[in-house]
């Protein structure tokens, strides 16, 4: 469990009135705020490095955070390969053909020929 403290007494003047988060399970102290430049904000040290101190507890409200790394992205285009290839050859037949590219809706005919081929290649594969 994490406990918030304000150090009220210490032989080290740089610690007096500083604020820390103590994680007793990890035996770590994280500096929240301190005078001078000995302890930096967000610096983590072992709790015993604080030495003999007196402190008062500070209420800490820790909300769990969701951390997403990587993630997934999906564009859904409900089309046949033949439709897109025909749209390349006969753009006048498909003036309203709209597809999804990187989360945006875009008219297929407004893409460059290279982009159109890229969409077809990425959308239609032989296997996963």
UniProtKB/Swiss-Prot annotation:
Q: Which UniProt keywords apply?
A: Organic radical
Q: Which residues carry this modification: Glycine radical?
A: 103
Write down the InterPro entries for this protein, in alphabetical order. Auton_GlycylRad_Cofactor (IPR050244), Form_AcTrfase_GR_CS (IPR019777), Gly_radical (IPR001150), Glycyl_radical_cofactor_GrcA (IPR011140)
Please give the Gene3D superfamilies that the UniProt record associates with this protein: 3.20.70.20
Q: Which GO terms describe its cellular component?
A: cytosol
Q: Supply one GO molecular-function term.
A: formate C-acetyltransferase activity
Sequence ranges assigned to domain Glycine radical in this UniProt record: 5-128
Output the SUPFAM superfamilies linked to this UniProt entry. Answer: PFL-like glycyl radical enzymes
Q: HAMAP family of this UniProt entry?
A: GrcA
Q: What does this protein do?
A: Acts as a radical domain for damaged PFL and possibly other radical proteins.
Question: What is the protein's name according to its record?
Answer: Autonomous glycyl radical cofactor
Which species does the entry assign this protein to?
Haemophilus ducreyi (strain 35000HP / ATCC 700724)
């Amino acid at each position: 469990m994490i406990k918030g403290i304000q150090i009220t007494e210490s032989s080290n003047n740089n610690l007096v009135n500083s604020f820390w988060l103590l994680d007793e399970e990890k035996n770590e102290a994280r500096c929240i705020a301190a005078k001078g430049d000995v302890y930096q904000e967000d610096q983590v040290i072992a709790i015993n490095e604080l030495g003999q101190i007196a402190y008062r507890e500070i209420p800490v409200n820790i909300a769990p955070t969701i951390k997403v790394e990587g993630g997934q992205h999906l564009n859904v285009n409900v089309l046949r390969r033949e439709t897109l290839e025909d749209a390349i050859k006969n753009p006048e037949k498909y003036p309203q053909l709209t597809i999804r590219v990187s989360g945006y809706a875009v008219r297929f005919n407004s893409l460059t020929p290279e982009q159109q081929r890229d969409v077809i290649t990425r959308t239609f594969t032989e296997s996963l």
